[in-house]
Amino acid sequence: MKEEEVSFFSEGERISAILRLPDGSPPGSWPAIVQGPGWLGLKDAKLYLPYHEALTAAGYSVLIFDYRGFGESEGDRGVILPQLQLEDLTNAVTYLTTREDVDADNIGVFGSGGTGGGNAILLAASDDRIRVAVSQVPVADGEDWLHRMRREYEWQEFLDRLENDRRERVVTGTGEM
């Protein structure tokens, strides 16, 4: 497996990425998989290497990147918004289509973890260029997931905090959350 550090732009922010390629010469071009990391994950996390090694051994190129605001990518630090992550994934797909060593008609998405798996589903549903999607351990219902992480009294306290924060933001423009 060969690695190439690359970057592309997403809504004006430079996105840092790693393109992992199969060894050898492509048969014209490689089919590709794009992966946005899971919850707070980064492109160089060792967790993803076994997947990428298997995919490149099977003849796929793999693009993994740091979402904007994370790792080496530009953007507001630590902002986690699914719609921004979806834009980054969509722009990652567009970047792949610009490469001569990638088969632009054979691009898939792989996502692992709550946000990674959920974002893979969102991308596949919204981008006709995606031919296949693998979503491993997604959060499909965020409210249910947040609820199950708490005891009932903690859930009620959390809902009260959300409502108080909403009210504060409406009046002052800022809030806790």
Roles of regions detected by a PLM:
Residues 38-53, 67:
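The serine-hydrolase catalytic nucleophile loop
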Residues 54-72:
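Conserved alpha/beta-hydrolase
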Residues 91-172:
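Primarily recognizes the serine-hydrolase "nucleophile elbow" in alpha/beta-hydrolase
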Residues 28-38:
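Short beta-strand element of the alpha/beta-hydrolase
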Residues 1-28:
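N-terminal cap/lid segment of alpha/beta-hydrolase-fold proteins
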